[in-house]
């Protein structure tokens, strides 16, 4: 109870004086109609602006904001442009030249190397081709870590696409190669000697091959249709295939819009053995879903009502299980004061397909012995308020109640000296997945402020209360707070900083040895932590920019996962070069 009061007090302190919360980035607060009158030749530069400073985001560094990844696709400008009205003559600043391509290289302590290359080329007025290469690696060197804590992550993506008046499409081919080490030995609980440590083979390699496509028909009932095939495997005999396709169709009748979404999602794979060395673990899940809905937009009110119907067929070690799920799909919003203040609410559910690849993306230190099963997200009921307090201040506040069956939790694997499995992940230095039913009460607030065209500030906070059926909500924090600041100091110099706080989390540890009178079973509380990062950059000219990036400035050797301390104070010095062919 005292800890909960402290969390609520912390949130109140951060938001006091700010007097408002921020608008969520992915929420729209209004629409406009434009008339398209003439085509033009698309360029990649019209679609986005190159980042001057790369982001180092890795399990052995720091915990960053959650990012959702989609099928790799290069942004390309539309082949149409809206008509431009003639404005009164005003003094204008010269626009910064935009480039289609860039290369970035950064080098830092811990033997860190960060490299990126992005290129694109228009083949005609409509067709384009592009490619991206990314590399992030570190030689490690975290204090008091007994095993190798180096890592590398290299990815290559190629895309080809076309945009016309009638149809947009693109196809993507990607490959990723990652290497990590299970370096988190439970030395606090187990007295490892040098011979035992030297006998551990702690490295793990992941490889991913993806083939994706996206189709968008401009006219007719068919909407955007994404599809993806992913082949994922590791160096310990694990392999997994994933395929999904999600077409959608809609049509309008007067003020009503009827929409139907279809989902076909398959995942199947196998592990060479389980945690105790028993060979051959296999699984497959095939989910089919249809989500019909009707949308009504009238004056300041928007209501979308529908339902999701899903069928799931699972086969685990030759045992078959068939299930049917029904979910609410209801969303509504009302403009209380035009686009300045909007109230919204909803009740949504979904069948979430879990996979080995997704678990590895979230936690690189899982063992290749996981139980894979989908999560039944029964409902997420929410209500919120968003909008603007002024032209420079936007806010969003939201409360929700969510119920999930078979929610996946990461928890530390046990260490048993009598385990016949001797792979490098069985020494209490890896993580498994357990499933439990979870109910979550969540309060979220966000504030975005542009003090001027050169200064932008944002702050957000989330408080969660968890209720489970069987055990703890393992490795889920009750409190998360983050803030960021970006400043254009001069035309040449820019800088930024961000800080985030993550509250306590709980995990469990089990150790058994013939020398013990009884096994050691312990619930461990991972301490809360904060992380402060900053960067500064200098634009030498329109093409060349130098940057300095500082991570974990306070040198907090916190544990993101049990027994896995992160790297301390990190420095990355580099440059970004933009160019056209």
Description of each model-found segment:
Residues 98, 103-106, 302-581:
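Exposed, low-structure sequence patches enriched in small/polar residues
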Residues 121-143, 261, 283-315, 450-465, ...:
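Surface-exposed extracellular loop regions of Gram-negative outer-membrane beta-barrel proteins
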Residues 83-85, 94-103, 107-144, 148-154:
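Outer-membrane beta-barrel translocator/receptor signature
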Residues 138-151, 155, 172-224, 228-242:
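Flexible loop and strand-edge segments within Gram-negative outer membrane beta-barrel domains
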Residues 203-212, 228-300, 432:
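Outer-membrane beta-barrel transmembrane domain signature of Gram-negative proteins
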Residues 22-93:
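N-terminal periplasmic/intermembrane-space "pro-region" immediately following the signal or transit peptide
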Residues 117, 156-158, 211-215, 243-247, ...:
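Membrane-embedded beta-strands of outer-membrane beta-barrel proteins
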